[in-house]
């Protein structure tokens, strides 16, 4: 393949600021074979037999439709043509006559006649037309070099688009054409000084690259958008990152960029940086950079649509934990998604995990493939059904391509089922070579109908809030103490389930303000027999154990409970969060300060209550994640009535959606527990907890309309009806 990669210096029509600086060399030099070009200049008499003469037509002006003009219209636009036609002028020079050479006047007329007013799809089509005319008998050259200029083609360019090409008659040589944008004038934030960060300044760009399948004007627009949205400190960073961005987003093999900063030096025209980069350079650089044994951060996507999808994912994550050189740092919520490419297959369960690893990208790929193979994945249909799928989505800021691996993942920016879980883990992630925030990419996608998955409702998809019925087996509960015992709990549980409870919450210790704690042994005596009785009697709905003792939680799960509901968010027992992680069960983490004995005195919020609750609850989520709890197993509770005055609880409920939309809580499930709380009676005038059903109804409605997944209530029959109506208001089209 003959390439124009080193275009600067090959042709006489290259700009004066060319890399090799030979713009003023006599034109006859331009077509000397490349390997002899410089020696021929030093010793012209030794290589005269190798010199190829040219006849030149410069700046031939005409007009034609060449693709789109600067306003994206298919309208005629000015065209300037430079043609360098190879021809031995020796005989014409000796005889001083025209018949032995190319008649440039005839050539000019022929070119104008055939081109003027014609329609060409691309600049390359026009170049091919010019070459074919030059090879005809009228002109009869065997080799032609062409510079095509469209001065009005690029909206932000002072001198438009230049297209450089070389053609040979009857040749199978695959010449690589080049495109240049000349004097692109853009504005961006650029500089290290404070005053340079306050206002955009002009930059002037000259960019050339090998012709590509991507439309040139699309590339020009991408350049303008990238540069004007950037805010680099140095011009070096601008050109390096721009070249990387274009190589990968526009599939360019190579690129040359010169960037001038006219306002940089008071007594000079401009400061400038000029670079040449290739796609392969970036790939090799990235690969070398990440071959070290230092720990790196990577993100893996996972999915399953065969068998018990949830269990398949749990198994794959457990296997990932056990691989030496990999540490799982965080796991996203889970999402059910319809198949995107091959449609005739079951829906998928998808998510993303964040890992720390010393492995290179290739070795990490092999580790993922080993898990797939061990779990029995068999690839039969491209993008078809699979028991497990593990892909490297991101690996630090690595850009890598090979026959077996591409990083970032090729489908990253078009897949909601990858972007959403990815951003749930790291909301501020940017694309490695576009530097576009991934949140912007997600915002641009049309909804792909993915649904948040629930690990606490018998592993179903939630289509609205669920009702959690409260079964307190405590003698001193603030609302219903002493009303549930082993004699009536089964009847009570069946009644709640029949009335609409999707989850039962069993508690053996009062957490009302001022309540004294009971011992672990006493709480175990109260709750374990109850859970065992319910399970042995055929109660199948999920059971939540309301406790902050890890031992109680462990034995309750072994007895048949499914969920841990810890009002202290793991602060009451340091073993609670690691226990939830090891058991791989959902845990509800509530916002609370102090203990039930002390929390009333801790209701002072110096700043905005939503912001303070967000910070404190976020710290508990982080503690859970660091303990190994996966985000899909975390349920959050704002803690109405706990270390909050009635007005604070009501205000927090009214702004619950603000708390839920914080980036650190993206797509997490929420529980609301306002039932019969003091603040509901404070505003309705109901002193007795059993009379607070109307205030509770209003709070439940407000909670559901703001998107909570669970409401925890005493009056199951009435509140299930309220939840049903609120779900209809929020979710029914």
Swiss-Prot record:
EC number in record: 4.1.2.25, 2.7.6.3, 2.5.1.15
Localization annotation: Cytoplasm
Region (DHNA 1) location: 55-167
Cofactor annotation: Mg(2+)
InterPro entries reported in the protein's UniProt record: DHP_synth-like, DHP_synth_dom, Dihydropteroate_synth-like_sf, FolB_dom, Folic_acid_synth, GTP-CH-I_C/QueF, Hppk, Hppk_sf
SMART domains in alphabetical order: FolB
Protein name: Folic acid synthesis protein fol1
Region listing for DHNA 2, in residue ranges: 179-277
NCBIfam families assigned: DHPS, folK
Domain Pterin-binding: residue ranges: 465-724
Residues with Phosphotyrosine modification: 281
GO molecular function: 2-amino-4-hydroxy-6-hydroxymethyldihydropteridine diphosphokinase activity; ATP binding; dihydroneopterin aldolase activity; dihydropteroate synthase activity; kinase activity; metal ion binding
GO terms under cellular component: cytoplasm; cytosol; mitochondrial envelope
Single GO biological process annotation from the record: tetrahydrofolate biosynthetic process
PROSITE patterns associated with the record: DHPS_2, PTERIN_BINDING
Keywords attached to this entry: ATP-binding, Cytoplasm, Folate biosynthesis, Kinase, Lyase, Magnesium, Metal-binding, Multifunctional enzyme, Nucleotide-binding, Phosphoprotein, Transferase
Residues covered by region (DHPS): 467-733
Pfam family, one: HPPK
PANTHER family membership: FOLATE SYNTHESIS PROTEINS, FOLIC ACID SYNTHESIS PROTEIN FOL1
Family classification: In the N-terminal section; belongs to the DHNA family. In the central section; belongs to the HPPK family.
Function summary: Catalyzes three sequential steps of tetrahydrofolate biosynthesis.
Pathway entry: Cofactor biosynthesis; tetrahydrofolate biosynthesis; 2-amino-4-hydroxy-6-hydroxymethyl-7,8-dihydropteridine diphosphate from 7,8-dihydroneopterin triphosphate: step 3/4; Cofactor biosynthesis; tetrahydrofolate biosynthesis; 2-amino-4-hydroxy-6-hydroxymethyl-7,8-dihydropteridine diphosphate from 7,8-dihydroneopterin triphosphate: step 4/4; Cofactor biosynthesis; tetrahydrofolate biosynthesis; 7,8-dihydrofolate from 2-amino-4-hydroxy-6-hydroxymethyl-7,8-dihydropteridine diphosphate and 4-aminobenzoate: step 1/2
């Amino acid at each position: 393949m003959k390439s124009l990669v080193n275009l600067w210096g090959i042709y006489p029509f290259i700009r004066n600021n060319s890399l090799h600086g030979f713009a003023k060399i006599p034109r006859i030099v331009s077509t000397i074979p490349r390997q002899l070009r410089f020696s021929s200049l030093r010793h012209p008499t030794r290589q005269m037999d190798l010199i190829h003469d040219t006849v030149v037509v410069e700046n031939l002006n005409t007009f034609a439709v060449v693709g789109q003009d600067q306003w994206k219209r298919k309208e005629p636009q000015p065209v300037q043509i430079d043609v360098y036609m190879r021809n031995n002028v020796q005989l014409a020079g000796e005889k001083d006559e025209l018949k032995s050479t190319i008649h440039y006047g005839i050539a000019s007329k022929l070119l104008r006649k055939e081109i003027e007013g014609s329609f060409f799809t691309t600049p390359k089509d026009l170049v091919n037309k010019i070459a074919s005319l030059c090879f005809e008998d009228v002109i009869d050259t065997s080799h032609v070099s062409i510079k095509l200029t469209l001065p009005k083609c690029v909206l932000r360019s002072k001198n438009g688009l230049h297209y450089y090409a070389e053609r040979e008659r009857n040749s199978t040589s695959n010449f690589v054409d080049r495109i240049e944008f000349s004097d692109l004038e853009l504005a961006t934030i650029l500089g290290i000084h404070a005053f340079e960060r306050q206002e955009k300044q002009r930059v002037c760009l000259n960019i050339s690259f090998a012709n590509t399948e991507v439309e040139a004007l699309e590339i020009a627009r991408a350049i303008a958008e990238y540069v004007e949205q950037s805010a680099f400190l140095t011009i070096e960073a601008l050109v390096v990152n721009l070249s990387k961005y274009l190589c990968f987003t526009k599939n360019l093999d190579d690129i040359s960029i010169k960037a001038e900063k006219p306002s940089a030096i008071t007594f000079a025209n401009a400061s400038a940086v000029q670079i040449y980069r290739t796609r392969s350079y970036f790939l090799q650089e990235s690969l070398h950079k990440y071959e070290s044994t230092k720990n790196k951060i990577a993100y893996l996507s996972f999915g399953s649509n065969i068998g018990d999808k949830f269990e398949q994912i749990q198994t794959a994550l457990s296997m990932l934990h056990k691989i030496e050189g990999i540490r799982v740092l965080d796991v996203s919520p889970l999402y059910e998604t319809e198949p995107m490419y091959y449609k005739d297959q079951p829906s998928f369960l998808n998510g993303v995990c964040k890992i720390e690893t010393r492995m290179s990208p290739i070795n990490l790929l092999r580790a993922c493939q080993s898990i797939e193979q061990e779990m029995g994945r068999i690839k039969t249909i491209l993008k078809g059904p699979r028991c497990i799928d593990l892909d490297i989505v991101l690996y630090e800021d690595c850009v890598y391509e090979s026959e077996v691996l591409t990083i970032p993942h090729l489908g990253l920016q078009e897949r909601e089922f990858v972007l959403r879980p990815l951003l749930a883990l790291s909301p501020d992630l940017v694309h490695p070579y576009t530097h576009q925030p991934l949140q912007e990419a997600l915002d641009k996608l049309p909804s792909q109908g993915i649904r948040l998955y629930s690990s606490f409702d018998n592993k179903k998809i939630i289509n609205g809030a669920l009702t959690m019925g409260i079964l307190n087996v405590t003698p001193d509960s603030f609302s219903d103490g002493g009303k549930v015992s082993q004699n009536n709990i089964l009847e009570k549980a069946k009644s709640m389930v029949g009335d609409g409870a999707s989850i039962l919450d069993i508690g053996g210790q009062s957490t009302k303000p001022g309540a004294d704690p009971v011992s672990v042994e006493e709480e175990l005596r109260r709750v374990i027999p109850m859970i065992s009785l319910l399970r042995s009697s055929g109660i199948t709905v999920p059971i939540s154990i309301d406790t902050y003792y890890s031992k109680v939680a462990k034995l309750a799960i072994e007895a048949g409970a499914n969920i841990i509901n810890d009002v202290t968010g793991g602060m009451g027992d340091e073993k609670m969060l690691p226990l939830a992680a090891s058991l791989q069960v959902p845990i509800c983490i509530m916002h609370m300060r102090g203990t039930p004995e002390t929390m009333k005195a801790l209701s002072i919020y110096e700043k905005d209550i939503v912001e303070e609750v967000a910070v404190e609850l976020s710290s508990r989520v982080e503690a859970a994640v660091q303990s190994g709890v996966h985000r899909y197993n975390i349920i959050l509770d704002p803690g109405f009535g706990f270390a909050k005055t009635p007005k604070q609880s009501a205000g927090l409920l009214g702004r619950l959606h603000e708390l839920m939309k914080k980036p650190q809580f993206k797509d997490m499930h929420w529980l609301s527990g306002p039932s019969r709380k003091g603040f509901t009676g404070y505003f309705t005038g109901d002193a007795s907890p059993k009379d607070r059903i109307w205030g509770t109804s209003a709070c439940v409605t407000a909670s559901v309309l703001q998107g909570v997944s669970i409401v925890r209530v005493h009056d199951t029959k009435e509140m299930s009806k309220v939840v049903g109506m609120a779900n209809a208001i929020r979710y029914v089209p």
